[in-house]
């Protein structure tokens, strides 16, 4: 069985990270959460009170505090900037609401995309994000474009937040997700869009295992 590159793209809370982690584990591939990388930069920007126009200062911060990943004892992914564990802080609402603006900065994307491509060269990788199939891994053997209704995605994010103890209002989440969809698909640099050769998969009404099985079946055809 050959190792392949799997690119999973889609809007906020479409289930990308959840299914990507399971697929990577099942195939013994590396999982790279690119969204966590943009969240890490956003977290640093907020922590240092940097605006989106302060690009040089942001890039300098990235050099001083490189983003890296680790594993907890239970096998969960940990995210670090420098040697500081920021796994939980990057999921806070404040970071979520600012990440689209930071991710739209061309120089930040360029730096992170280059890092993502470097990691992917090892082969046997599952990567999820907004522009994996179109920009980061245009040569990936399998590209998936995951979508779901705004209502369903808000419901999922709501349950995740409650489980993490993050105070959340469902109606506010719906508005935030719709606004983020617009920002992500209308930005100038690497907008969210389906790659021409991507498999379109609407996950509305499907459970996680059903989505995983559909993607694994597509992957196995290419191995």
UniProtKB/Swiss-Prot annotation:
Q: Which GO terms describe its cellular component?
A: cytosol
Q: Which reaction does it catalyse?
A: CMP + ATP = CDP + ADP; dCMP + ATP = dCDP + ADP
Sorted UniProt keywords: ATP-binding, Cytoplasm, Kinase, Nucleotide-binding, Transferase
Main localisation = cytoplasm
Q: Where in the cell is it found?
A: Cytoplasm
Q: Name one Pfam family in it.
A: Cytidylate_kin
Per UniProt, where does ATP bind? Answer: 10-18
Q: Does the keyword Translocase apply?
A: no
EC numbers, comma separated: 2.7.4.25
Question: GO terms for biological process?
Answer: nucleobase-containing small molecule interconversion; pyrimidine nucleotide metabolic process
Which superkingdom heads the taxonomic lineage of this protein's source?
Bacteria
GO MF annotations for this entry?
ATP binding; CMP kinase activity; dCMP kinase activity
Q: Which family does it belong to?
A: Belongs to the cytidylate kinase family. Type 1 subfamily.
Name of protein: Cytidylate kinase
